[in-house]
């Protein structure tokens, strides 16, 4: 079983310090929500983000959306060889059942995430997605993997096909992919750093390469 973690994902509700910013207030009014109920999004809150620490990398729920669509629609997931988790910058973990089918439409995805943050689990009765307060280290400890790989542009350069074979040789590997647009992880993560290409890749590209080559190694 491959465990894929989108870590330090820039997925969060609008922080209290900018909830009265005009960009946030106007956006929330258009969507008929209170500012504190809205997901932070750099597309709409760019001016407000300038007032936040790390504002140049925050408000990127689109990264999570694309990564999850790629992972959940993969053959590995459909065949029961994949588990996917999202860990946020605020140390929340989103558990996602394999049968989950996320909205393809980005605005509907935002609405789903807003409901998740508000209710703790969605949809009611099925709980396909569940969020809890938990640091990355505790999530990895719960998974109890036999190895942990951190996808990192400064990691050991390994061809994607070879990396897929390495993953398939383990019983319970964890692969950590950064859910942020640029820069490094904010905190150290124990594991082996791996790079799949000589240049930086977007998170969703890394997710696709990891899963497709894992599938190939399994003969799926």
Swiss-Prot record:
Origin: domain of life: Archaea
GO molecular function terms noted in the UniProt entry: rRNA (pseudouridine) methyltransferase activity; rRNA binding
Residues that hold S-adenosyl-L-methionine according to the record: 178, 183, 196-201
Catalysed reactions, as listed in the record: a pseudouridine in rRNA + S-adenosyl-L-methionine = an N(1)-methylpseudouridine in rRNA + S-adenosyl-L-homocysteine + H(+)
Disulfide bonds listed in the record: none
Site feature (Interaction with substrate rRNA) residues: 60, 101, 104, 108
Keyword set includes RNA-binding: yes
GO biological process terms on file: rRNA base methylation
Free-text function comment from the UniProt entry: Methyltransferase involved in ribosomal biogenesis. Specifically catalyzes the N1-methylation of the pseudouridine corresponding to position 914 in M.jannaschii 16S rRNA.
Entry's family note: Belongs to the class IV-like SAM-binding methyltransferase superfamily. RNA methyltransferase NEP1 family.
Protein name: Ribosomal RNA small subunit methyltransferase Nep1
Originating species: Thermococcus kodakarensis (strain ATCC BAA-918 / JCM 12380 / KOD1)
């Amino acid at each position: 079983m491959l465990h894929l973690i989108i870590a330090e994902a820039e997925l969060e509700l609008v922080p209290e310090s900018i909830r009265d910013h005009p960009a946030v207030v106007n956006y929330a009014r258009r969507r008929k929500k209170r500012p504190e109920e809205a997901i932070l999004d750099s597309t709409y809150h760019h001016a407000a983000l300038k007032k936040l620490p790390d504002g140049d990398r925050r408000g990127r729920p689109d990264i999570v959306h694309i990564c999850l669509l790629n992972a959940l629609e993969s053959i590995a997931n459909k065949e029961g060889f994949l588990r996917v988790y999202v860990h946020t910058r605020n140390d929340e973990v989103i558990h996602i059942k394999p049968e989950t089918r996320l909205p393809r439409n980005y605005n509907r995805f935002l609405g789903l995430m807003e409901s998740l943050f508000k209710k703790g689990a969605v949809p009611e009765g099925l709980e396909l997605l569940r969020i809890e307060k938990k640091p990355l280290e505790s999530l990895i400890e719960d998974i109890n993997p036999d190895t942990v790989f951190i996808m990192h542009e400064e990691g050991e350069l390994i061809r994607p096909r070879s990396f897929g074979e390495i993953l398939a040789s383990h019983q319970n590997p964890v692969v950590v992919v950064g859910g942020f647009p640029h820069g490094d992880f904010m905190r150290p993560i124990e594991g082996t750093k791996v790079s799949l290409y000589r240049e930086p890749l977007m998170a969703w590209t890394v997710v696709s390469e990891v899963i497709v080559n894992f599938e190939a190694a399994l003969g799926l």
